[in-house]
Amino acid sequence: MSERKKPFLVFGLPRSRTAWLSNFLALRPGAVGHDTAIDCKSIEEFIGQFYGLDRLSGTCETGAMIAWRVLKHKMPEAKMVVIQRPTTDVAFSLGRVGLFPGLLELEQRKACLEAISRLEGTKTFSFQQLERKDVCEYLFEFCNGEAAPKGHWEHFADFNIQVDMQKRMAKLKANAEAIAKLKASVMREVAMISAGEQCLRLN
């Protein structure tokens, strides 16, 4: 598979410019998803978004990092990116819009991000680095397999693209049952992958 056709997965905590990146990294409007996992009923549905005629080029996710082992197993060709931001900064930013997540959950997601960062080929950037043109243009080329169009950075640099967190929380509540089932299926698949890896080590 050519570099241009390989899907990319960008992972970061909430309030880490993932919504902005889903617009900046898109070769055409709508080509890159944002938190698409919350609309998927299965891991297969999530993965299926990146293959076929109307495929997404990639997605920027704030929760799907918990499935990193399954995604790496089933999408070994996918390019992975991690955006790191301190959990205390994330919690403060969320608090400014009236949301107060548990730090334990944020730390668990951060641990997943750190595991993804250790994978060979993963590109990791800090939240602050996304203010730099050279970093964002490098990230664009890594994800898309081609350089950003002239003036692309300048067009998006001053855009403050953020998720309406109140609407997002309402959506999460409405999809809570499906999301719980998706998480459970991910955990089962992780257990199967771990068991398979253990068998290989024993042999």
Task: Name the predicted role of every residue range.
Residues 1-7, 114, 118-124, 131-133, ...:
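PAPS-dependent sulfotransferases, especially Golgi type II membrane carbohydrate sulfotransferases
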Residues 21, 91, 173-174:
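A periodicity- and composition-biased signal for non-globular, repetitive helical segments
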Residues 2, 16, 22, 42, ...:
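Generic serine detector
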